[in-house]
Amino acid sequence: MVEGRFQLVAPYEPQGDQPQAIAKLVDGLRRGVKHQTLLGATGTGKTFTISNVIAQVNKPTLVIAHNKTLAGQLYSELKEFFPHNAVEYFVSYYDYYQPEAYVPQTDTYIEKDAKINDEIDKLRHSATSALFERRDVIIVASVSCIYGLGSPEEYRELVVSLRVGMEIERNALLRRLVDIQYDRNDIDFRGTFRVRGDVVEIFPASRDEHCIRVEFFGDEIERIREVDALTGKVLGEREHVAIFPASHFVTREEKMRLAIQNIEQELEERLAELRAQGKLLEAQRLEQRTRYDLEMMREMGFCSGIENYSRHLALRPPGSTPYTLLDYFPDDFLIIVDESHVTLPQLRGMYNGDRARKQVLVDHGFRLPSALDNRPLTFEEFEQKINQIIYVSATPGPYELEHSPGVVEQIIRPTGLLDPTIDVRPTKGQIDDLIGEIRERVERNERTLVTTLTKKMAEDLTDYLKEAGIKVAYLHSEIKTLERIEIIRDLRLGKYDVLVGINLLREGLDIPEVSLVAILDADKEGFLRSERSLIQTIGRAARNANGHVIMYADTITKSMEIAIQETKRRRAIQEEYNRKHGIVPRTVKKEIRDVIRATYAAEETEMYEAKPAAAMTKQEREELIRTLEAEMKEAAKALDFERAAQLRDIIFELKAEG
């Protein structure tokens, strides 16, 4: 394994609160503190702080985000900060996933249906192989990193290691490649190899642009070259190369034979059990399905849904902890949990949701009981895998605060921007008061966000504001991705002055033009009016120098009090720092990116409005889908995963409408 060092490349030095936050976190890690929390206010440069920490402690790092979009953003940022190190991306490789399920009430079996994204599968292989080759590795993952993977020992042992001068029969190499689930195929794809006389060309599972050309002289490897898969151009000579398995669920032949025996034994026991309960249909179904899978495993070495037999393949006892990405890391690794107030509850909930669905399949003869052991980690198992962990959030939850000896604060923004001022006003006459405030913002060419508690109120308020002559849009959960991006962009361009919504905490709403956030029914305790939600909502006005928040309420709840006091405390710290250093807060300047060039542009609104998707012919729609798919692939290649994900959602919508 290469002992690489992290090299942070950035055009600026840590500023404001960042140097002290970095020093405290690094000191904690060096002293062996297990849990630490970074309380970083919105827009204080938390990613840059964490990058500095990673560079200084020099440990393999796993960064966990709560969805693919955020993971994509973090991956792009970290790749820019660490261009000379291995920054990898590990998220669920399904573009679309319908898990296997059974609905007993209607006797409906839903087969597993999935569309695997080849690009993401490649990146997953690249991530696991990097962990075996070097130490300067950062893997950005979604919560899917706690789902079961194959055994890391098995994965490591089955690596095919080739050196110049090594004695190995050509056919023996081909057999070893087939053992690790490579296919022989003359058309070049990841996870395949092709043979031309004494030359074997291998296309590793972790990349599709390069292939490894192994040249034999008799039974000896004469030379190894890295070749451009497309042009055939030689990119370099290699003395040694390691070919990693094409699947994370690989097993040696003798282990597979043992696993098949154990599966057969479990099948016999389960069939006897079902028949004794008079469940003859379930028994017949289970026998038919399992025998087919066993036949495939004997003949091909794998079967569809092989992960359901992962406990047997790894020869693990019932109920034991499954292997996950965390087991591929060395023991001294570091975990960073981004937006921990959302990510930790997600990690906690994964096991129960998965278990409930699989239990129904087992009860009705679709799967053996051992399938229950192909599962995500429980939260307790996740805790046991932690070596050292840093939770990052603007509003850490009770778990993080309880487990961290002290919270490291990062309150000051490099831009000098302050947390917004807050007013609490009575609900009587609130709408007329709000209209007056909105008009003030319109005159200054600033925007307003209004959050309500119910859908009905949001709709009524939108209609009322429209009647009052205000340019307003309503953002709700049923709005499709394409429209959502378009509405946010139009708000920034000034087509709308106000955005009304229920949940303003979703990503994509950090808009520098917003100087006023109005919170209606602020005194109604609940999920969207808890102290954490209120602080996050207040943060939506923190990117503008005139940021202000109005809470309409008749009483001040405990959550409101905590949120107001916390915001005031942060603002006082920020003001003091600005005064000391002579900093004048300036609104963030953020370019208005044209997210989907092919579908609309502000400059050509007439053309776009003339052809909404519903009015397109089948041919025009197909042409648009082709263009968008090409753009999506380009965006993925350029590592702009946020844009690629948005384009993917739009393509789904267009296909659904067609």
UniProtKB/Swiss-Prot annotation:
Residues annotated as binding ATP: 40-47
Helicase ATP-binding domain residues: 27-414
Cofactor remark from the record: Binds 1 Mg(2+) ion per subunit.
Residues annotated as domain Helicase C-terminal: 430-596
Keyword hit for Cytoplasm: yes
GO molecular function: ATP binding; ATP hydrolysis activity; DNA binding; excinuclease ABC activity
InterPro entries reported for this sequence: Helicase/UvrB_N (IPR006935), Helicase_ATP-bd (IPR014001), Helicase_C-like (IPR001650), P-loop_NTPase (IPR027417), UVR_dom (IPR001943), UVR_dom_sf (IPR036876), UvrB (IPR004807), UvrB_inter (IPR041471)
Primary location class: cytoplasm
GO cellular component: cytoplasm; excinuclease repair complex
A single GO BP: SOS response
Ranges where the UVR domain occurs: 622-657
Position of sequence motif Beta-hairpin: 93-116
Gene3D superfamilies cross-referenced by the UniProt entry: P-loop containing nucleotide triphosphate hydrolases, UVR domain
Cofactor requirement: Mg(2+)
Assembly mode: Forms a heterotetramer with UvrA during the search for lesions. Interacts with UvrC in an incision complex.
Task of the protein: The UvrABC repair system catalyzes the recognition and processing of DNA lesions. A damage recognition complex composed of 2 UvrA and 2 UvrB subunits scans DNA for abnormalities. Upon binding of the UvrA(2)B(2) complex to a putative damaged site, the DNA wraps around one UvrB monomer. DNA wrap is dependent on ATP binding by UvrB and probably causes local melting of the DNA helix, facilitating insertion of UvrB beta-hairpin between the DNA strands. Then UvrB probes one DNA strand for the presence of a lesion.
Listed name of the protein: UvrABC system protein B
Organism: Bacillus caldotenax
Lineage: Bacteria, Bacillati, Bacillota, Bacilli, Bacillales
